Amino acid sequence: MLQNEVENFANLLEQATVYLAPYQEKIIVVKYGGNAMINEDRKKLVMQDILLLNQLGVKVVLVHGGGPEISQGVKLLGKEPQFINGLRVTDQDTINVVLQMLAGKVNKSLVALLKGKGVGLCGIDANMLQCEKLQAEVDYGFVGEIVKVNTQLLELALSANLIPVISTVGVDDQGVAYNINADTVASEIAMALGAAKLVSMTDIAGLLRDRFDESTLIPEVEVSEVQGLIDQGIIAGGMIPKIACCTDFINAGGIEANIIDGRVPHAILVSLFGGKNGTLFYKK
């Protein structure tokens, strides 16, 4: 390295240390999905960034979805995936696919990219995600809502400096498996662990005033402003439950929550190191 390159690198490290300080030896929960999960190159970048954070002393818990793989598996059975209000209708065949693809293939492919630092888990392990059938006007089948998060296994992994990689399947008191929304799982785990930050990766720039115009990105939202944005129709559709998970986490004592654009290279690092990415939710 030339002298000026060394100096530039040192300055970069110094700046990064300032932004990283609040998170060292703290827990960050990352909900991982969307385009950053489908694109193999971006997937590798995300895993590299998570490994880097682990090496820098940040305790990362990774919660992942796997919608495209599940839909592909359902189609191989000769069925069409069904969604109502953004939630997957999960019959017996579909929950079997969820267990095979989400808790199996998808989970282990992510663990493999973490080079010995990842440990693959699902909510059934040690009753981590105790749930019950989701009660709604529509019968979604084997879709659950969380009753309790048992953190013992997660705390054990984190204390060993490992990265828990969690697929979003829970279990009820009869041993029945349920599919659970990944944003909900990430938020509930973050609250149960007392995490400092919740990060949700999406396929969009963040919260937009005009959902067809990414230049209308809202970079920051104080949680007391959320209801007004819902009333204005700015927060609508699938963003309502996603943002509700963020506000629940913050109101439970979390420092901040980010909805970030997973299409941006190194999106997690950008959000932690003071860069502009997505929408930050916080409480005064």
From Swiss-Prot:
User: Keywords, A to Z?
Assistant: Amino-acid biosynthesis, Arginine biosynthesis, ATP-binding, Cytoplasm, Kinase, Nucleotide-binding, Transferase
Q: Which residues form a coiled coil?
A: none
This chain belongs to which protein, by name? Acetylglutamate kinase
Q: Where in the cell is it found?
A: Cytoplasm
Q: Which domain of life is it from?
A: Bacteria
Q: In which pathway does it act?
A: Amino-acid biosynthesis; L-arginine biosynthesis; N(2)-acetyl-L-ornithine from L-glutamate: step 2/4
Asked whether the UniProt record includes Nucleotide-binding among its keywords, one would answer yes
> Which Gene3D superfamilies does the annotation name?
Acetylglutamate kinase-like
